[in-house]
Structure formats: structure tokens, C-alpha cells
UniProtKB/Swiss-Prot annotation:
One of the GO BP terms on file: tRNA methylation
Main location: cytoplasm
Disulfide bonds: C120-C351
Location of the protein in the cell: Cytoplasm
Source organism: Helicobacter hepaticus (strain ATCC 51449 / 3B1)
Name of protein: Dual-specificity RNA methyltransferase RlmN
A GO-annotated cellular component: cytoplasm
Function in brief: Specifically methylates position 2 of adenine 2503 in 23S rRNA and position 2 of adenine 37 in tRNAs. m2A2503 modification seems to play a crucial role in the proofreading step occurring at the peptidyl transferase center and thus would serve to optimize ribosomal fidelity.
GO molecular function: 4 iron, 4 sulfur cluster binding; metal ion binding; rRNA (adenine(2503)-C2-)-methyltransferase activity; rRNA binding; tRNA (adenine(37)-C2)-methyltransferase activity; tRNA binding
Residues the entry annotates as binding S-adenosyl-L-methionine: G177, E178, S209, S232, L233, H234, N308
InterPro entries from the UniProt entry: Aldolase_TIM, Methyltransferase_A, RlmN_N, RNA_MTrfase_RlmN, rRNA_lsu_MTrfase_RlmN/Cfr, rSAM
Catalytic residues of the enzyme: E94, C351
Keywords from the named record: 4Fe-4S, Cytoplasm, Disulfide bond, Iron, Iron-sulfur, Metal-binding, Methyltransferase, rRNA processing, S-adenosyl-L-methionine, Transferase, tRNA processing
Amino acid sequence: MNIDFPFQQPSLYGYKLNELKSILSPAFRAKQIYHWLYHRYENDAMRMDNISKTMQNYIREHFALSQIYPIRVEHSIDGSKKYLFETYDGHCFESVLIQMRDKKLGHKGEVVESEKWTMCLSSQIGCKVGCAFCFTAKGGFVRNLHASEIVEQVVIMKKDNQMAPHKRVNIVYMGMGEPLDNIENVTRAIEILSESEGLSISARRQTISTSGIAPKIKQLGKLNLGVQLAISLHAVDDKLRSQLIPMNKAYNISDILTEVRAFPIDTRKKVMFEYLMIKGVNDDLKSAKKLLQLLNGIKAKVNLILFNPHEGSTFKRPEINDVRAFADFLIKRGLLCTIRESRGIDISAACGQLREKVKAENVSCETLT
């Protein structure tokens, strides 16, 4: 069992159930504790009232529970929420909860409305990749988040929104950081979150988004977790992509697509290619044609994202008519393509807007306790 804990005491959120069973006696206590952590969202051992005082004291003495603390949540007019977390060592990072509502016809012809939740998790404090369009990159890199800190983001957001333990949510590793630069902790978090006795969030409902570290895509594929893959492509030639994403100089488009073609994907799923559209940079039909050629033979879905303005950037948001023309070009030629509806722009929670810096802004926010 190789668990990297930076704390004086290891966090219970960093253990898989079988690992906890191997260190607690009797072993059934592990299942009880898992139930308290992930079904009751309890983070105080002394309130776990179906375990003995001896076990409560043992947990308190040998383990930590909360290692990240929600210090603020901002509410968007579209229902999204941005959470600001502080870590045990005094750093801050952000995650986003996205609420979407679906309407469909019921079996009697009535309109049925349902809500869907997506949690956009951070994997690092800051980021090393340095994408030219991303606000996170402006703050530099601080450190990796540990598996327990990734898992606890989900627990806190579920608890704060009074979600049932097995309420279906989608997880996207698209917050702060490059997930494959922290692959050990991210994949451990995926396994913990998918534990059937815990939150039971299937790996098929979890998506790792990467800027394209080709060897790590290969490593992830060999683990065969069943997780979904998203590639932050954003350009169709290496010259432009290297300007937007400096890592492209190490792992170019061809390197990335070679590993994508070999990546194990559920027969019902597709690899998502994220394409950030920037006015006058990559939003023309010539780029659409090249993108179509690049993805030929790949089970692909293209997600077009409109650039979200942020402090210090000279890039501009594209015209919606250009975005629609780009999408129509791909769709008419058989490539599945969607235009992402940006969520949380008013609270700087949209794609590319997250950053560690705590800003004194006049926004609707509350302190969590």
C-alpha cells in the first residue's frame, strides 16, 4: 500500500475500503467508518455513535479527517457554485459545482424536469503547463493535491448541497492543474470515489481532461480504470498549439493522437476533444477542415468552448456565428460536435478562469462552517 500522506496523521479519505480493513480490527469497522464518511458525511470520529469509544479514540489519535476546509462559496445566476478551499498547509484552490436541468417527455406525455450535477475538481494547486489562455497558469505551480484532498472536494460539495450519497453526479478533472501530471493521486481518488460501499461514482462517470502528456495517456490506458478521456487540443497545427500550450513542444499533436488511438474506451463512449475557440486565432473553417482530418478514424466528440475573458489576457471571445459555422461544418461531415454552454462566468468559475489567488470581490458569497 503506497499512500503519500503529507500530514502528521494520514487522512481516512485517502484509503480504499480493503486498505482500511487491513489496518482496523475487527475488519467490519472499516465498513462502518466508510458509511459514516460517505453516507453520513461525518468528519468527527466522536460522533460515529455505532463504534466503540476505544475505536473513536484510536481514529482520532491515528488519523485525520478534514484536510481541506471550505472558506467561501460563490453563487452564479445560472445555479453554478464556485468553492474556495484552504488546505492544511495554508494554500487555496477552487472547484466548481455545475447544476443543469433537463426536460423530457414522460411515458404519459407530460414534461418531466430533472437536475444533473457535475463536479469540476482540481488536481493541483496551480499548474505547470502554462497555457497562454488559462488564468490558473498565471499563478504558477504550488503543489499536487493528494488523493484525500481530491476525494474530500466531492464529499464537501455533496454535503453542502444535501445530496443523497448515491445521487448520480458526473466528475470532471478539469479544475486547477493538469491531472496526468498528478496521475497517481488522481487515479487513486477515482478508485476511492467508485467504491461501492462509499459514494459509488462509477469510473465511467469520471472524465480526466489532459493537455496531452503522451506517456501519461499511455500509462492511464494500461490501468484500464474505465475512466473517460478528454484531450485539450485547441489547435490543429503544432506551431499554433505550441504557442497556446508550451507542452506541445515535448508532446506534439501526432504523439498525442497516437496514444489516443490506443486508449481503451468503452464501446458506448467517445474520446472528447476540447477545442477552445479564440477570435481570429483558431475559429475559421480552414481550422475546422484540418480538425476533421486529424480526428479521422478516432471515435471522437468535439466540444467547442468559447474563450472566457479574464484579467491580463489579450485574447477575445469569438463571434457566436463563427462558432456555429465551425460546428455545422463538422456535424455535416459526420463528426459529433457540441458547443459548450459556459457556466459560472459571472463568478469566474468557467473554463480557464480558476486561480489560487483570493480576490476581494463584491460577489454573493457565504462562509461555510
